[in-house]
């Protein structure tokens, strides 16, 4: 009997230790996020990394937009089936999903935010939330406006007029090459790492072109996903606007899109050195407003609408180098395209942790999720939802 009792006590102690271990915050180094293959992080770990990720760039010089005096209005018609809402709520109780918005035919039809016991005490409708890779797609949209405003001649223009890239593989790259992440830089760059080991996110364009890319020639023009091309694109806009990037993004995001609050992009140092980073912070509703503006632009007979269609028509295959969202098969102007099983015309913005904003131009639908981990069934809540409007 004593032996059995001892085994039971030992078992309780071990299970208690295992439980305590499971409730600890797990980290992956100073600047690391939760790896997506680490499938089931506990709530403390998710909350810790959400707060850490959302504080990125706070010490840097910031490129802000001002709130619009006449923000674009949002119409609500929350009438989706209860079982659909129940599925979203269930995922919000057990995964890294924080916010879910669906927009159809001019109205927000789903609007769900994480409950207070999960993330709802950390975020509300006015909280500026951070996304890195969605900033790549925003850069593609801003390039279109730079063309339409006359700062850049066309998609076929080269970067040869920019002194900072002289003597590098970027000198002969076209704007089209750049926004399709196909400048032939794969020998020197993989994801966010340079061949020297330096991280792109810590560097200016001037620093990279002076060191790693000095006297380089482009390789085969194929898709190579990284932060570098979108950083180059944003800083090329800065160069073409006389290094008045803040003024330019205000003309687009405040005046054209009609953001209700601020949008922030990061960068530190002298603007002419190429300091602007392809990330942004904005509220969940303002991020949706960007998607709505892109949808409306596509449906308009305007310069920016035609630009978006040209970009989509000239998309490139990701091939075997399919990194980024891991689902789409093609890339167009820093937007993900050609999602498996979806025949509609869809362009997507995608970020770390399951942050996604997909636009279905055929069905006039947008699905926008914010999350800290992609363990919420992306296939159903994003891909099936953008295709069918339900899941």
List the model feature ranges, each with a label.
Residues 106, 127-154, 178, 233-237, ...:
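Active-site SXXK
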């Amino acid at each position: 009997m004593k032996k059995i009792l001892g085994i039971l006590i030992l078992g309780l102690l071990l299970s208690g230790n295992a439980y305590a271990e499971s409730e600890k915050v797990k980290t992956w180094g100073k600047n690391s996020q939760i790896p997506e293959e680490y499938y089931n992080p506990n709530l403390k770990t998710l909350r810790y990394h959400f707060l850490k990720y959302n504080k990125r760039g706070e010490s840097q010089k910031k490129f802000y937009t001002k709130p619009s005096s006449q923000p674009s209005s949002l119409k609500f018609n929350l009438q989706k089936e209860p079982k659909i809402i129940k599925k979203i709520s269930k995922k919000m109780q057990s995964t890294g999903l924080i916010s879910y918005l669906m927009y159809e035919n001019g109205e927000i039809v789903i609007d769900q935010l994480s409950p207070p016991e999960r993330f709802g005490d950390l975020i509300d409708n006015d909280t500026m939330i951070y996304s890195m890779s969605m900033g790549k797609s925003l850069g593609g949209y801003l390039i279109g406006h730079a063309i339409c405003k006359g700062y850049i001649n066309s998609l076929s223009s080269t970067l040869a007029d920019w002194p900072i890239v002289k003597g590098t593989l970027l000198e002969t790259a076209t704007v089209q090459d750049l926004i399709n992440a196909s400048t032939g830089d794969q020998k020197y760059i993989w994801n966010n790492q340079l061949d020297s080991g330096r991280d792109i996110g810590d560097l200016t364009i001037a620093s990279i072109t002076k060191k790693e890319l000095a006297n380089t020639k482009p390789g085969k023009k194929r898709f190579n996903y990284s932060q570098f091309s979108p950083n180059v694109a944003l800083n090329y806009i800065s160069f073409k606007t006389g290094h008045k990037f803040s003024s330019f993004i205000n003309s687009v995001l405040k005046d054209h899109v009609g953001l209700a609050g601020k949008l922030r992009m990061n960068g530190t140092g002298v603007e002419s050195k190429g300091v602007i980073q392809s990330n942004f912070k904005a509220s969940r509703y303002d991020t949706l407003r960007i998607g709505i503006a892109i949808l409306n632009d596509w449906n308009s007979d305007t310069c920016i609408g035609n630009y978006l269609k040209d970009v989509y028509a000239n998309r490139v295959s990701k091939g075997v180098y399919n990194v980024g969202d891991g689902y789409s098969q093609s890339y167009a102007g820093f937007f993900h395209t050609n999602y498996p099983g979806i025949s509609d015309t869809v362009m997507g913005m995608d970020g770390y942790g399951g942050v996604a904003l997909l636009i279905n131009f055929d069905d006039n639908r947008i699905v926008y999720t914010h999350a800290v981990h992609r363990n919420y069934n992306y296939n159903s809540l994003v891909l099936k939802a953008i295709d069918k409007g339900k899941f």
